[in-house]
A protein has these predicted regions:
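Short, structured coil/loop segments at alpha-helix boundaries
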Residues: 1-2, 197
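N-terminal capping segment at the start of a domain
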Residues: 2-17, 145
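Phosphate/pyrophosphate-binding active-site segments
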Residues: 8-9, 22-31, 197, 202-207
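Cofactor-binding active-site loop characterized by glycine-rich and histidine/acidic residues
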Residues: 11-135
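Glycine-rich ThDP/TPP pyrophosphate-binding loop and its adjacent helix/strand module
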Residues: 78-207
């Protein structure tokens, strides 16, 4: 993980990227998915604003250059199966719906999808969770990156987990994470800032 964090740090600093809290809070989850999934399984990042974390994981496991992916696709994923990007996302709540469709369309292929806690404000997320449960869909896993922050406000993680497990008890993995990485505040500031030179050097030194 140390090399992944360093790679993500470098790209974020060199490109003056925001959404740092989203990137760093989900990096270890995406890495674990790719480390353990079957080769044929697919991954969809529904909270597309965290895509730079996906880019560095794709670099690790498939040799794709993370900086080139950022230059090519930008800060939200655009579907290109050749580059292992299985869904264009950005508008929150849409990726999980596509993931459900992919799982229904091919029962022999497992689909992993990540959503964020802030994304749970979208009604389509709850429709998808209910459909997964009511239809008995088995070849999908919904990973929730619960870092405690939505776009404008904190999220009640305990209440959110209770509600989500009530909707979809069988296919949910709820990951309680934090945005407090490398000196970032555990606040909205972690989502809407970029690294200064001083912060970057301190972050590198802490690895």
């Amino acid at each position: 993980m140390k090399k992944l964090y360093r790679r993500l740090l470098d790209i974020c600093y060199e490109n003056k990227l925001h959404h740092l809290g989203s990137y760093f809070s989900c990096l270890h989850i995406i890495d674990e998915i790719y480390r353990t999934k079957n080769e044929d399984d697919i991954f969809i990042l529904s909270n597309g604003h965290a895509v730079v974390a996906l880019y560095v994981v794709l670099e690790k496991y498939y040799g794709l250059d993370a900086q080139e992916l950022l230059d090519k696709y930008g800060e939200h994923p655009k579907r290109n199966e050749l580059d292992r990007i299985h869904c264009s996302t950005g508008s929150l709540g849409m990726g999980i719906c596509v993931a459900v469709g992919r799982a229904v369309g091919n029962p022999n292929r497992h689909v992993h999808v990540m959503i964020s806690d802030g994304e749970s404000n979208e009604g389509s997320v709850w429709e998808a969770l209910r459909y997964i449960n009511d239809s008995g869909l088995k070849n999908i896993t919904v990973h929730v990156n619960a870092n405690g922050w939505a776009a404008y406000d904190p999220v009640n993680i305990m209440l959110l987990e209770q509600r989500m497990r009530a909707f979809c008890p069988g296919r949910l993995k709820f990951h309680r994470t934090t945005v407090n990485y490398f000196g970032l505040d555990n606040s909205l500031h972690a989502h809407y800032t970029n690294f200064t030179e001083e912060q970057y050097k301190e972050a590198i030194a802490s690895l």
